[in-house]
């Protein structure tokens, strides 16, 4: 997680300051077994700090940035905005150039969205060469990249709050 200087008015724990936050999780379930592991890791990391995960599913990695943008706006308009977002999916290299487009454009769109909207966003879209690499990175018992993506989003949210850009709930 994030470390911060301990001022007198700083929260006792960054983790305590994240309790009750709403985290949007958008997952691509193109590979169900990988998606299950990524989601389990992300959900565990979010719940560990007392935050709430709201999960939506899209067909593939390229749809994730658009879905996050749509759902963030819908949350704002409904009066229940999300505090952070997590993108989960997997792109495995094939025989064509499709991998390069999906991997590059999904990452670019997520970064553009995060920077332009000041959105704490964790990118858990795996870009790998083989199914074995994907499983090793997705499994909670191994590299737990879903949990890592959620922790990244929560760390960015803590930074945003420490900078007084967003009040704690």
UniProtKB/Swiss-Prot annotation:
This is 6,7-dimethyl-8-ribityllumazine synthase. SUPFAM superfamilies: Lumazine synthase. 5-amino-6-(D-ribitylamino)uracil binds at residues 30, 61-63, 90-92, 123. The gene is ribH. InterPro entries: LS, LS/RS, LS/RS_sf. (2S)-2-hydroxy-3-oxobutyl phosphate binds at residues 95-96, 137. The lineage of its organism: Bacteria, Pseudomonadati, Pseudomonadota, Alphaproteobacteria, Hyphomicrobiales. GO terms for molecular function: 6,7-dimethyl-8-ribityllumazine synthase activity. Pathway: Cofactor biosynthesis; riboflavin biosynthesis; riboflavin from 2-hydroxy-3-oxobutyl phosphate and 5-amino-6-(D-ribitylamino)uracil: step 1/2. It comes from the Bacteria. Pfam families: DMRL_synthase.
């Amino acid at each position: 997680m994030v470390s911060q200087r301990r001022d007198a008015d700083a929260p006792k724990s960054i983790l305590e300051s994240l309790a009750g936050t709403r985290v949007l999780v958008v997952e691509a379930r193109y590979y169900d077994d990988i998606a299950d592991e990524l989601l389990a890791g992300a959900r565990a990391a979010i719940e560990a700090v007392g935050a709430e995960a709201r999960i939506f599913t899209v067909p593939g990695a390229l749809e994730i940035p658009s879905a996050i943008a749509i759902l963030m706006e819908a949350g704002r308009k409904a009066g229940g905005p999300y505090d952070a977002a997590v993108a989960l999916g997997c792109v495995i290299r094939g025989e064509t150039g499709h991998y390069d487009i999906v991997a590059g454009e999904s990452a670019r769109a997520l970064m553009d969205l995060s920077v332009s909207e000041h959105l704490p966003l964790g990118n858990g879209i795996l870009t790998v060469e083989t199914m074995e690499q994907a499983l090793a990175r997705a499994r909670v018992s191994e590299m737990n990249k879903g949990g890592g993506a959620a922790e990244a989003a929560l760390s960015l949210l803590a930074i945003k709050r420490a900078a007084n850009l967003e009040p704690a709930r």
